Regions:
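Membrane-embedded alpha-helical segments and adjacent helix-loop junctions characteristic
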Residues: 51, 65, 69-184, 337-338, ...
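Flexible hinge motifs at transmembrane-helix junctions and intramembrane kinks/re-entrant loops
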Residues: 36-39, 51-69, 75, 99, ...
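Structural signature of hydrophobic alpha-helical transmembrane segments
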Residues: 35-46, 104-113, 162-166, 245-247, ...
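Juxtamembrane and boundary regions of transmembrane helices in multi-pass small-molecule transporters
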Residues: 1-30, 117, 123, 182-214, ...
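Hydrophobic alpha-helical transmembrane segments
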Residues: 10, 45-46, 65-68, 143-148, ...
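Transmembrane alpha-helix interface/packing and boundary motifs in multi-pass membrane proteins
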Residues: 54-61, 152-161, 195-207, 297-301, ...
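Hydrophobic alpha-helical transmembrane segments in multi-pass integral membrane proteins
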Residues: 204, 294-298, 347-363, 470-478
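Interfacial loop-to-helix junctions that mark the boundaries of transmembrane helices
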Residues: 2-3, 31-41, 56-60, 93-106, ...
Length: 548
């Protein structure tokens, strides 16, 4: 560990310890206050949350290792398997199984299935050959080739990791960038087109980028638990609004790049190294069929064929493993760190939900007095700002559990803007729109490393696209609300919300093993002041997960 990282570690640790010993009673959390007294488990969750947030922002350790630390700390200090000195009389500890279950959360399986598809596509050059075929219609005019590169990058990013997509497309682009004259600023437009396409394209599908999956998991789980009166959002529904949103942003980004970096080159020929005829080997054909099958199943939705989106993601896992398409070596090279990072966020959500801390925190802020517009705009801007300086996944992991609880508490006020669904989707999009600096996203860093981009141009492009993207997402959510895309709000939405905000969970909240399986990163609000966190058996949890 370097000296700088050690200093960051010490600062974050000290602040987390301070959070554990703050005089919360003097801050309003006392018996006489409607907010009530924080129990020891709630205070420990605050300490872990502060530590995780600072570690994710300052990064004294890899961000995925912070998630692992979160899970371990929760198990040994808050669970029914914690060390004896941490047991609290009169307070039911969180089930250790519910914390561990975050590693096998259905959203984790959805992402893992996406990793299998991406690895197989790369291994059998499906990505390169698709790029060759799809770029052909854009001709040799540099302006249209630029648009083509952006759109193709966006399409790949919908099903592959943003980083892998950017790395692949920059490799394709590398020989072309060398063809530009020294004084032709157009080369910067091409270099920036790749991270823009990767960052924006990932918003088109639930598996395109982790913030989407985190928001979708939080939303659908809240609906399954009955905390939210809305319809679950399927893979196909997400694409129905996500893909048009991506296309509009891509066109805007294309025009913006040409304005900032005029292209002088008159003709351009792309020779994609490694691409050729499509592989017709048996394993390659298995990849093609499985890829098309999964996409079709996701797009058509559970209502047509009956298979849950998360279950569909397991099809390529089984098929590719049994046929040898994916080997042990391929498995070892997958981005397990991303899955562990997301699992840590889900574990925080379990802690917030199970201890009743979310309800306490909500009562400290008069969200009910906020206008729905102020709530949505404020959350979006905060999320966008944070996403420019820290991991997009970390940003969503920190904010989604809290904002889900806030949205549930104020769901009657949000109906005109699309409800809690609109709030969480716009927050997920805001997390992906933070791309104004080289450190904002891995695709930005890769593009900056080519030497063809400058920080100023990246900042201008990133800020403009971030703000335009936010405004467009709000407008889209309002439009979808007016056409009842997410379903007609039920009366219970207005009835359940006040009860949920009325009182925090009691200190003796009962938490069961499977609560987290159904809760993930979401934060459930109790129904009344005498309510306890409902005891859910494993069968009920499986049913809740299937309800997604």
């Amino acid at each position: 560990m370097t000296k700088a990282k050690f200093i960051k570690f010490v600062i974050a640790t000290i602040l987390a310890i301070v959070a554990l010993y703050l005089p919360y009673e003097s801050l309003g959390f006392d018996a006489a206050s409607p907010m009530g007294i924080l129990n020891p488990l709630e205070i420990r969750v605050i300490g872990v949350f502060v530590m995780a947030a600072l570690f994710w922002i300052l990064q004294p350790f890899p961000i995925w290792s912070t998630s692992m630390l979160v899970i371990v700390l929760m198990i040994i200090t808050m669970s029914d398997s914690s060390l004896s000195p941490f047991r609290v009389d009169g307070v039911t500890m969180i089930s250790h199984k519910s914390i561990m279950a975050t590693f096998a959360n259905p959203i984790i399986m959805l992402f893992l299935g996406g990793f299998f598809l991406a690895a197989a596509a790369t291994k059998y050059k499906l990505d390169l050959n698709l790029a060759r075929v799809l770029l052909k219609p854009f001709g040799k005019n540099p302006k249209f080739v630029l648009l083509g590169l952006m759109l193709i990058t966006a399409v790949f990013s919908m099903f592959m990791s943003n980083t892998a997509t950017a790395a692949m497309m920059l490799a394709i682009l590398a020989p072309v960038l060398k063809l530009f004259d020294e004084n032709d600023r157009g080369k910067a437009a091409f270099a920036l087109a790749i991270p823009l396409g990767a960052n924006i394209g990932g918003m088109g599908t639930p598996i395109g980028t982790p913030p989407n999956a985190i928001a979708l998991g939080a939303l659908n789980d809240a609906i399954a638990r009955g905390d939210l009166a809305a319809n679950p959002v399927s893979f196909g529904q997400w694409m129905a609004f996500g893909v048009p949103y991506v296309i509009i942003l891509m066109v805007v980004a294309w025009i913006l790049l040409m304005k900032i970096y005029p292209i002088k080159m008159k003709e351009m020929v792309l020779n994609i190294e490694g691409a050729g005829k499509f592989d017709t080997s048996p394993k390659a054909i298995i990849v093609y069929i499985t890829f098309v099958l999964c996409v079709l199943l996701w797009v058509t939705g559970k209502g047509v064929h009956g298979i849950n989106d998360n279950a569909i993601a397991m099809i390529p896992m089984a098929v590719f493993a049994l046929t040898g398409v994916i080997t042990k070596k391929d498995l070892n090279e997958m981005s397990w760190d991303v899955l562990w990072l997301v699992a840590g966020g889900f574990a925080l959500g379990v802690g917030l939900n199970a201890t009743g801390l979310a309800a306490h925190l909500i009562k400290t802020i008069p969200f009910a007095s906020w206008s729905p517009v102020a709530l949505m705009v404020g959350c979006g801007i905060i999320c966008l700002f944070m996403a420019n300086f820290m991991s997009h996944t970390s940003t969503a992991t920190l904010l989604v559990p809290i904002l889900c609880a806030v949205g549930i508490a104020c769901q009657d006020n949000l109906v005109g803007l699309g409800g809690v669904t609109a709030l969480l989707v716009s927050v997920a999009f805001a997390s992906s729109l933070g791309m104004s600096m080289p450190i904002s996203t891995p695709p930005n860093a890769l593009a900056h490393a080519t030497g063809y981009t400058d920080t100023k141009g990246m900042a201008i492009t990133g800020v403009v696209m971030g703000l335009l993207g936010l405004v467009l997402s709000w407008g889209m959510m309002i439009l979808l609300a007016n056409i009842h895309f997410f379903g007609t709000p039920e009366v219970k939405a207005a009835e359940a919300a006040p009860a949920a905000v009325e009182a925090p969970a009691p200190a003796a909240a009962v938490v069961d093993t499977a609560a987290a399986v159904a809760a993930d990163s979401t934060v459930a609000l109790p129904a009344d002041s005498a309510a306890k966190v409902e005891v859910v058996d494993s069968a009920a949890a499986a049913s809740a997960a299937e309800a997604k």
